[in-house]
């Protein structure tokens, strides 16, 4: 603290009012609660009133990154561990609202790992509500969470990153509502299934799967779950046939982003409202969609039927390509409730889009994201029957247009086939900003099925 600030805190005769120090201690502790713990401890030098206040803050946020060795790119891990260990001894009988610990266990060895286990056991006994443990050791999985974690009755929020989880003999997490598991190594597939099934009020589940997590079958079964995210790094060197089954009758939001999973089995998702899908059902490593593979076709059909009740959908072009290939064998199910659609293109041809739009009879809003348009011979999107975009009202093409032929074909298709389109929003690339008048002139020559349509250029 600078001299002026220190004078405001300590001077009794000053006209300036130190309104912060005049706050009740309970409120001051809540203010300190939102600061990194190392900064909270520093507040003890402000005045005699602040000297011991940090000991009563109801939450710890401890990170080895706060112990940077000056003029180097390294951290003082030993000082960090000593600091945390001594810190945990203060007011050890009080209840904790939150505890966040970030460390790097590379080279720690058993004595140091035992320290971390002791800290976890301590915060569990102090009835912690919000717990986050992050190991930045680059997938070494040296640290395994102690079994006391599985029976913490007060825990409401839990996030684990870079850790190992044993297969628990007994789980009871009656208060847990939100669970985030990132790059976590499970002892077996039952470890995850048991953990989820014994969280009776779990509402939000977020799983970022590890590259070494190769269980053939993973089941997410929950009667209370409202939101589920399943993400994995796309690694096309892996050629695994993995299955994920989801049984969550109250689920409202679903995000799937994993190209390795061969089959997503969706059971009873009638409550689903919103989905974000980026999967190719393991059609990677030069594996192509095979029309004669009836098992794959049945799985894709069941998957599409499983999400057909949604109102909002974000879908990757890679997924759309699989759906397009499937549609040449069987008709797509109708997405009668779908009113908002976003398609993100990453180097795939957008000509697949109209086939999917045919299955969305009540679509009102369409956003075409980062598309990479490429000329393609032999493709005629205007062969799609006119008027099937009978409900579409708003379209936005976010990728900056460069005036290329395929871009203008997309714009023409939308204008010529949308019965009640109210607004088409386009973005121009900076390289052709000076040619905006030329683009506008070309747009004005395109017939519009909807006379009320307004074209806006950003």
Curated annotation (Swiss-Prot):
Keyword field contains Repeat:
yes
Give the UniProt keywords, A-Z: Leucine-rich repeat, Repeat
Classification via SMART domains: FBD, FBOX
- All copies of domain F-box, residue ranges: 17-67
Residue ranges of every copy of the FBD domain listed in the record: 376-428
Signal peptide interval: none
* Cross-referenced CDD domains: F-box_AtFBL13-like
Q: Keyword Repeat on this protein?
A: yes
Stored InterPro entries: F-box-like_dom_sf (IPR036047), F-box_AtFBL13-like (IPR053781), F-box_dom (IPR001810), FBD (IPR006566), FBL13/AtMIF1-like (IPR050232), LRR_dom_sf (IPR032675), LRR_FXL15/At3g58940/PEG3-like (IPR055411)
Q: Where are the LRR repeats?
A: 152-183, 184-209, 231-258, 302-327, 345-370
What name does UniProt use for this protein? F-box/FBD/LRR-repeat protein At1g78750
Instruction: Tell me the organism.
Output: Arabidopsis thaliana (Mouse-ear cress)
